């Protein structure tokens, strides 16, 4: 096992449902049940997911369900463990150079694509050549010091990554979050920036895609050529059920085998039929402040908003029990190896909030707050935030809507439609991976942050190879981001997966951030 830290997607997410797309009604659900194999089939595992992926293109997908689908069809060079370490997948071994300027990867031999063709270094080179192109939409991790990482073919089963400058985070950035695609299938594709590739997927993962019906389901069948061994379960259905309440009912009725549930749902489940698996995703749920909005350009106003909030109330109301959440104060999750609590915590102080508003010369401050209206936790928190800010004399209008639409708007340069927004991210352990959230021009910088101090600290820490010096830089960075008051970390909430007891080896399949299962092929039907 290689003791690297996994850098997960720079995902703009909302609550428990990272993707909120198609809004199917009862007719849609009936169609899904009749057209796709359902739970109870002794050869099919059915998992309820909360929406369609924003992209099924493995080159640029970065949302929960897009990555879940990708992880079933394709394979990366290494895979992530629940504790953030990684082990080899398509890689046989990985050799970082002593000077930190290159990384040699020896590939597994005798791996076949699902169509029977050989997997080789040509496929790896082809994949990274597409991934590194910024126009394709997910290249941030493959650029160091504003220069792209290069990849070279050494021989049929060896590739070499060449860095423009040493980077402490290079291994995490190179080795993760990229799924290898077959050159012989996609070599004639001219545009990899699209959300759906024109060719039928051919992969090295445990399953092959049979059918995708938007808003209803994905169906998969076992990949007979899977290098990890033929999956125990022949068929998998991902059934799209947007409502968590509807998914819970489907689980109780045996219409699906697994679903994500809320803490408040657990007491409703029959533990003789259903088992519950809470596990950490190192996810930060937060309140974001849009610094481009006129009302929030003054840092004192932003700080006033944060002092008016009470995160203990927000978490108790939404998650009920500390068994299901931890309370963060940094932009890093509480168990991150670089996290420090030596930052401004913005302990609740309504009077301090009023003083800051007075110093800023602001009266009658009115803001709006965007949140995912289909997410129960966010709906609860949005209402409480409105009440808490009112106590400091700040009026808040709630703007509930579709999560994907909200973050599509926030991603627009200089967007000012929303002042405040609820969101979340899962990024991994190396703080450099968080740069896309906070650096000027970052691909997921929904806060519209434009701080020279923050940019410089990210840049310095990325190339600092001395562990103690790097840790000190990240301490300074956490304080700088807190001082800017662009993000109010609220919660590190656990994901709670409820599974019908007819499904076995759940923990052996690996419960991990974003993807749910590290390797779904290890699941069994009892």
Report the location of each language-model feature:
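Surface-exposed binding/hinge segments that line
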Residues: 95, 99, 142-186
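Long beta-strand-rich cores associated with HINT superfamily self-processing modules
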Residues: 497-526
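Ligand-site clamp/hinge motif
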Residues: 223-267
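Extracytoplasmic/peripheral linker and loop segments enriched in polar/acidic and small residues
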Residues: 397-400, 404-406, 435-501, 526
């Amino acid at each position: 096992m290689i003791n690297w830290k996994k850098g997960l997607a720079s995902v703009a997410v909302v609550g428990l449902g990272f993707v909120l797309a198609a809004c199917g009604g009862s007719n849609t659900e009936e169609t899904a049940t009749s057209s796709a194999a359902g739970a109870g089939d002794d050869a099919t595992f059915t998992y309820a997911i909360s929406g369609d992926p924003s992209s099924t293109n493995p080159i640029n997908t970065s949302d929960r369900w897009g990555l879940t689908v990708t992880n079933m069809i394709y394979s990366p060079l290494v895979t992530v463990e629940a504790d953030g370490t990684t082990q080899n997948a398509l890689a046989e071994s990985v050799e970082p150079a002593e000077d930190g300027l290159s990384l040699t990867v020896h590939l597994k031999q005798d791996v076949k694509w699902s169509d029977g063709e050989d997997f080789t270094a040509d496929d790896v080179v082809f994949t990274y050549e597409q991934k590194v192109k910024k126009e394709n939409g997910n290249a941030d991790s493959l650029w160091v010091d504003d220069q792209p990482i290069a990849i070279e073919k050494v021989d049929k089963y060896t590739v070499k990554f060449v860095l423009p400058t040493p980077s402490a985070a290079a291994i995490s950035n190179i080795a993760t979050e990229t799924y290898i695609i077959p050159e012989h299938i996609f070599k004639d594709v001219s545009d990899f920036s699209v959300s759906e590739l024109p060719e039928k997927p051919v992969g090295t993962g445990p399953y092959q895609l049979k059918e995708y019906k938007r808003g209803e389901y994905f169906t998969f069948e076992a990949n007979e050529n899977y290098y990890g061994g033929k999956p125990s379960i022949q068929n998998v259905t991902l059934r799209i059920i947007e409502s968590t309440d509807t998914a819970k009912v489907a689980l109780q009725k045996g219409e699906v085998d697994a679903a994500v549930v809320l803490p408040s749902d657990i007491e409703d489940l029959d533990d003789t039929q259903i088992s519950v698996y809470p596990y950490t995703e190192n996810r930060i749920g937060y309140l974001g402040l849009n610094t481009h909005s006129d009302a929030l350009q003054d840092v004192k106003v932003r700080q006033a908003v944060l002092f008016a909030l009470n995160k203990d109330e927000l978490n108790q109301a939404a998650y009920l029990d500390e068994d299901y959440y931890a309370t963060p104060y940094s932009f890093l999750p509480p168990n991150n190896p670089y996290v420090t609590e030596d930052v401004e915590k913005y302990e609740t102080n309504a009077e301090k909030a009023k003083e800051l508003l007075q110093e800023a010369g602001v009266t009658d401050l009115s803001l709006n707050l965007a949140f995912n209206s289909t997410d129960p936790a966010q709906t609860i928190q949005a209402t409480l935030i409105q009440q808490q800010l009112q106590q400091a004399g700040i009026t808040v209008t709630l703007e509930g809507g579709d999560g994907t639409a909200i973050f599509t708007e926030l991603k627009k340069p200089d967007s000012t439609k929303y002042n405040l927004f609820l969101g979340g991210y899962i990024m991994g352990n190396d703080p450099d991976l968080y740069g896309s959230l906070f650096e000027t021009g970052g691909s997921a910088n929904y806060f519209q942050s434009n701080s020279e101090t923050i940019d410089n600290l990210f840049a310095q820490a990325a190339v600092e190879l001395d562990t103690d010096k790097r840790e000190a830089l990240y301490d300074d960075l956490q304080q700088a981001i807190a001082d800017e008051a662009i993000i109010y970390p609220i919660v590190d909430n656990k994901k709670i997966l409820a599974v019908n007891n007819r499904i076995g080896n759940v923990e052996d399949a690996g419960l991990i951030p974003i993807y749910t299962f590290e390797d779904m092929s290890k699941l069994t039907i009892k």
